[in-house]
Swiss-Prot record:
Gene name for this UniProt entry: ureD
Role this protein plays: Required for maturation of urease via the functional incorporation of the urease nickel metallocenter.
Assembly notes: UreD, UreF and UreG form a complex that acts as a GTP-hydrolysis-dependent molecular chaperone, activating the urease apoprotein by helping to assemble the nickel containing metallocenter of UreC. The UreE protein probably delivers the nickel.
Major location category of this protein: cytoplasm
Name of protein: Urease accessory protein UreD
Domain of life according to the entry: Bacteria
Subcellular location: Cytoplasm
Phylogenetic placement of the source organism: Bacteria, Bacillati, Cyanobacteriota, Cyanophyceae, Synechococcales
Matches recorded under PANTHER family: UREASE ACCESSORY PROTEIN D
Family as reported in the entry's similarity comment: Belongs to the UreD family.
InterPro entries: UreD
Gene Ontology cellular component terms for the protein in this record: cytoplasm
Molecular function, one GO term: nickel cation binding
Length: 267
C-alpha cells in the first residue's frame, strides 16, 4: 500500500521557465533542461499496486509551457487502486501530456478521477490509452473493475456562470467483469486497445495521420467542439496495439506544438 504524491508547478519569468516540484514515493519527477522543460513522471514499482492511493497535481502559470512524459506503460496489479489527477492551466500556457498506455491486469480494480481547468487561451494535449489486459501473456478482459471519470472546466469568459467557470466536457468509463458489453461488436468488437487524444484550447486545426498496423488500418473518429469559447478536438482510436495508438497521438501533439512555434523534443 502506497500513498504517492507528485506536484509540479511551472511559472514563466522572461525567457525562462521556473519549476517547483514535490514528490512522495513511489511517484518521482525527473526533469531535463530546455525550453519548454520536459519532465518524466516515474514509478519504480513497475505499476500501481493494490491499496495504492496516488495524487498528481500540475499547474501552469500564464505563458508557461511544459511537457510531461512517462517511461513505460502503467500496469495495474490486483486489488483496489485509486488515483486523483488535477491539472490547472492559466492563460496562454501549454501542456503536452501523452502518457503510455494503461494495462489493467487480472483482478485489478482501478478508480481514477481526472479534473482539468483551463483558460480558453491555454492549450492542452492530453491522452488516455487503455488495453484489455496483459495481451503479451494472452490475458484479455480479466480485470475486475475500471472506472475513469474525466472532467474539463473552462475557467474564464463565462459571464453566465456564478463560479466563473463551466463544465465543458465530462466522460465516464465504468467497466465491470466479465466485460461482455464493451467487447460486443457494437462497442469495441475484436479491438483490444482504445484511446482518446484531447486537444483542448487554442490549437491550430490538426492533420490526422492514417495508422496501419500489420497492414490493417486502425479505425479512428474525430469530434470537434462546437463551443465558441473553448475550441478543441477529440480523436478516438482503436486497434490491436496500444503502443501504435500512443505513438500516433504523440506525433500529432508534436506536430501541433511545432506549428505553434515550440521546439519540443522528438517523439
Amino acid at each position: 500500500m502506497n500513498f504517492g504524491k507528485a506536484i509540479l508547478k511551472a511559472t514563466r519569468r522572461g525567457e525562462h521557465t521556473r519549476i517547483w516540484e514535490y514528490s512522495q514515493a513511489p511517484l518521482q519527477w525527473l526533469g531535463s533542461p530546455g525550453e519548454p522543460p520536459v519532465y518524466y513522471l516515474r514509478n519504480p514499482n513497475g505499476g500501481l499496486l493494490g491499496g495504492d492511493r496516488h495524487r498528481i497535481e500540475i499547474g501552469l502559470g500564464p505563458g508557461s509551457a511544459l511537457e510531461i512524459r512517462t517511461q513505460g506503460a502503467m500496469r495495474l496489479h490486483p486489488g483496489l487502486i485509486r488515483q486523483q489527477v488535477k491539472v490547472k492551466l492559466a492563460p496562454t500556457s501549454q501542456l503536452i501530456w501523452i502518457p503510455h498506455p494503461t494495462i489493467p491486469g487480472a483482478g485489478a480494480d482501478f478508480r481514477q478521477q481526472v479534473q482539468i481547468e483551463l483558460d480558453p487561451t491555454a492549450r492542452l494535449a492530453y491522452a488516455e490509452i487503455w488495453t484489455a489486459g496483459r495481451l503479451a501473456m494472452d490475458e484479455r478482459w480479466q480485470f475486475e473493475h475500471l472506472a475513469n471519470c474525466l472532467q474539463v472546466w473552462v475557467t474564464a469568459g463565462i459571464p453566465s456562470s456564478p463560479e466563473g467557470r463551466k463544465l465543458w466536457l465530462q466522460e465516464h468509463i465504468d467497466l465491470h467483469f466479465p466485460h461482455r458489453q464493451v467487447s460486443a461488436a457494437s462497442v469495441l468488437g475484436s479491438h483490444l486497445c482504445w484511446g482518446s487524444l484531447y486537444l483542448l484550447g487554442d490549437w491550430p486545426e490538426p492533420t490526422w495521420l492514417t495508422v496501419h498496423i500489420s497492414g490493417t488500418e486502425s479505425p479512428y473518429w474525430l469530434v470537434k467542439s462546437p463551443d465558441p469559447i473553448c475550441k478543441g478536438w477529440i480523436l478516438r482510436q482503436v486497434g490491436p496495439q496500444a503502443e501504435a495508438i500512443w505513438r500516433h497521438f504523440g506525433q500529432v501533439a508534436l506536430q501541433l506544438a511545432q506549428a505553434k512555434g515550440g521546439s519540443p523534443q522528438g517523439w
